[in-house]
Amino acid sequence: MWKSILAIAIGAAAGALLRWFLGLRLNSLFPSLPPGTLAANLVGGYIIGVAVALFADMPMLSPLWRLLIITGFCGGLTTFSTFSAEVVDLLRQGQLQPAFAAIAVHVSGSLLMTMAGIASWQWLRR
């Protein structure tokens, strides 16, 4: 149990630090669609795609790796709550077009990046 908790905590801390760094570096570039949050969600979608495919192909890997990468790192990196708050803020400001653009880009982009991650792993294992 303690190993699982430690794996999740280490992964979550690393993911959250990367999310903070992306926001710090990117959000001022285009505030109406904060690119740091978008980058975190797209990168996280890609990483989780690779991880899901990798763990499916390598069931002999310790479950601690899955907890570290998927539950911890991707959970700490991706940020649905921040995305939701940013969209609601845009809606409250009457910025409907940027709000709906953010929804479309985050959701479709994350799904596409997850599929790209799975495809990347399948390509790499050949």
From Swiss-Prot:
Chain sites annotated for binding Na(+): G75, T78
Predominant location category: membrane
The entry's keywords: Cell inner membrane, Cell membrane, Ion channel, Ion transport, Membrane, Metal-binding, Sodium, Transmembrane, Transmembrane helix, Transport
GO MF annotation, one: metal ion binding
Disulfide bonding pattern of the chain: none
Source domain of life: Bacteria
Catalytic activity line of the entry: fluoride(in) = fluoride(out)
GO cellular component: plasma membrane
Biological process annotations from GO: cellular detoxification of fluoride
Database matches in InterPro entries: FluC
Topological type in the membrane: Multi-pass membrane protein
Activity regulation, per record: Na(+) is not transported, but it plays an essential structural role and its presence is essential for fluoride channel function.
Keyword RNA-binding: no
Keyword Cell inner membrane in annotation: yes
Location within or outside the cell: Cell inner membrane
Transmembrane segments: 4-24, 36-56, 68-88, 99-119
Similarity section: Belongs to the fluoride channel Fluc/FEX (TC 1.A.43) family.
Functional note: Fluoride-specific ion channel. Important for reducing fluoride concentration in the cell, thus reducing its toxicity.
Protein name (Swiss-Prot/TrEMBL): Fluoride-specific ion channel FluC
Species this protein is from: Chromobacterium violaceum (strain ATCC 12472 / DSM 30191 / JCM 1249 / CCUG 213 / NBRC 12614 / NCIMB 9131 / NCTC 9757 / MK)
Name of encoding gene: fluC
